[in-house]
Amino acid sequence: MVGLVSISDRASTGVYEDKGIPALQEWLAGALRSPWRAETRLIQDDAPTISATLTELVDVAGCDLVLTTGGTGPARRDVTPEATLAVATKEMPGFGEQMRQISLNFVPTAILSRQVAVIRETADHAALIINLPGQPKSIRETLEGLRDADGKSTVPGIFAAVPYCIDLIGGPYIETDAAVVAAFRPKSAQRTPR
């Protein structure tokens, strides 16, 4: 199960339509070959609400992966990273570093992004939680990575590492569509595709 959380004061109050959750659902539908279902939440940019939502998705709903979108900039109301770190048992800094590296190919303000990724563990379950950018185009770019004019991957997106991370924390074996994003696993962890 995948938790999808869009964090936006204005979208959560109906000022405008949320684009984060639909973008994540569309991308996952094209990228995942394994069966999956989503638990979605559209919430305000408020640290206690974000932390409570992440905790509920992992501890109660049993999500193995939670993707958030929004609330990662430097504005005073942007508290997604702090709320995510508050529920973490382990930090996974490489995900945020790679997202900023990918986004810097497009905009110099990517350096202002504060996305984090963490593991949340309970006695019998663990999940990977990743903060993604707020814009659908940036979500796709950071998940897929960069390609040259011929469509060959030049910079891997962060999702290439997600299936193996889920393996390592005891979650289900996730298969991806290599045309969208090729999951990387060491040979010893690979299975024959179904």
What are these regions (language model features)?
Residues 1-194:
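Non-catalytic beta/alpha edge segments that cap or flank active sites
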